[in-house]
Amino acid sequence: MPEKHAWTRWFWGVMGACALAQLVLAGATAGYAADYNTFWAWALRVAEEGFSGFYAEGYFADYPPGGILLLWPLGKLAQLLHISHASAFARCLLAAPGILAGMGLAALCYRLAGPGRARGFVLGVAAGASPALLYVTGVWKQMDMVYLLFLVACFAALGKRRLFAAALCWGAALALKPQALILGPVLAVCVLADAWYSPK
């Protein structure tokens, strides 16, 4: 039991350090300018117009409603506190959903591999501290980690034959990015296979 607690403490210590590093990177770097400016424009628009007025004819917005939903509280907070989108705080704010999702993804991998064990620690840290993912979130301020969290949760649920939970996670991923459609056939095959091989 003490060893299990030690692995858990080490895991969350590393994840906390990764989150702090991403916040520092987010505040110190400008991000991918085209996406950064677009995300903040969308955040402020949905905060001002609401969801019913966001997707107006002639207005460019190629993200599904789930992605805009993530931006809505950021826009509201920016309005409330009069935050300039060019400030370091605004950069950290935009990176926050991805950072939190990254910690959630790492925790999910840690649990799937066996919490309190070396393999769980290794897999969780490999997922949450991947340099590529840290760069995408901390430097580019993308929210791909939120999308990825739901996809991994979908496959984790499929592995346990929890089809309804898997469908919900896939639907959440699809609401964030249409690329989740690629995995639709995989989910369909799993559902059909479960129905076919279930005891009659």
Question: Positions of the model-derived regions?
Answer:
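Extracytosolic helix-loop segments that constitute the early lumenal/periplasmic catalytic or substrate-binding loops
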Residues: 35-62, 66, 76-83
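Specific aromatic-rich, kink-prone transmembrane helix
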Residues: 108, 146-163
